[in-house]
Amino acid sequence: MSSSSGSAVNIAIVTLFPEMFAAITESGISRRAVEQGLVKLSFFNPRTYTTDKHQTVDDRPYGGGPGMVMRVEPLAKALLAAKQWHSEQRAEQALPNTAKETVIYMSPQGAQLNNQAVDTMAASGDFTIIAGRYEGVDQRFIDAFVDQEWSIGDYVLSGGELPAMVLIDALIRKLPGALGDAQSAEQDSFENGLLDCPHYTRPEELADAWQTSVDDRRVPAVLLSGDHKKIELWRLKQSLGRTWERRPDLLNKLDLDQSQRNLLTEYQQQKLSCSSSDD
């Protein structure tokens, strides 16, 4: 990503609803990344590039059917403006203008976004993200201009803005300096192919009023031990166990070493023992 050379990562967003992105420009880690100059965001509304008084960006689908389809011309003009913005940013940052930003369309028909894909994107440069609306975008625009299509899951949303924000937030977390602790990203779920381990904070024991069992009220003793090696092994075991219970498909993709297999076996045996004692 551009930030590795000390320059900002540039992300242009083509959207009919730029105001929705206040969720990432005004809050949390993404806001700080913008303020620190780690990432630059710019928004391009296709309505700005229409020529009729109604600012029409959609029309009925050929062949009939429900809904409306976003037209090529306003999208293409918005994308052209985004390309010009990218060129200006590269000039300001003294980057070679031979570089080409990746054009991404957020779509239920796209490949499913995962951590590996975000890692690959994070190493590839700048982006323009297309957030569609209505029944979708004229396929001719996709064929002519889009480099990649990505989905955030097997369900349909009202538009591409929320998926675009998901992608931007995931990318920002990969930027050096975006997180307060560099280890935060390294310990996220999926960074090592596993789900994250459980986390606890004060107090050490919850009050009886929470009506949980005694064991559930207390922080696991190993986390209070100060033994960093034991804590590391406990966290790895919990990650392995959680992944086995909740996402066994992820485990099938990993080549666990012997120590990891031993930890997983321990977890499984402990779970079996607890289940037997409950019967």
Curated annotation (Swiss-Prot):
Function noted in UniProt: Specifically methylates guanosine-37 in various tRNAs.
UniProt: S-adenosyl-L-methionine binding residues: G132, I152, G153, D154, Y155, V156, L157
GO MF term list: tRNA (guanine(37)-N1)-methyltransferase activity
Subunit details: Homodimer.
PANTHER family the UniProt entry points to: TRNA (GUANINE-N(1)-)-METHYLTRANSFERASE (PTHR46417:SF1)
Broad class of where this protein is predominantly found: cytoplasm
Name this polypeptide is given: tRNA (guanine-N(1)-)-methyltransferase
Pfam family, one: tRNA_m1G_MT
Superkingdom assignment: Bacteria
Catalyzed reaction equations: guanosine(37) in tRNA + S-adenosyl-L-methionine = N(1)-methylguanosine(37) in tRNA + S-adenosyl-L-homocysteine + H(+)
Subcellular location: Cytoplasm
Enzyme class: transferase
Cellular component, GO annotation: cytosol
Family stated for the protein in its record: Belongs to the RNA methyltransferase TrmD family.
Keywords: Cytoplasm, Methyltransferase, S-adenosyl-L-methionine, Transferase, tRNA processing
The organism of origin for this protein: Saccharophagus degradans (strain 2-40 / ATCC 43961 / DSM 17024)
Keyword Transferase set for record: yes
HAMAP family in UniProt: TrmD
A GO BP entry: tRNA N1-guanine methylation
InterPro entries with a match to the protein in the record: Alpha/beta_knot_MTases (IPR029028), tRNA_m1G_MeTrfase_C_sf (IPR023148), tRNA_m1G_MeTrfase_TrmD (IPR002649), tRNA_m1G_MTases_N (IPR029026), tRNA_MeTrfase_TRMD/TRM10 (IPR016009)
E.C. number(s) listed in UniProt: 2.1.1.228
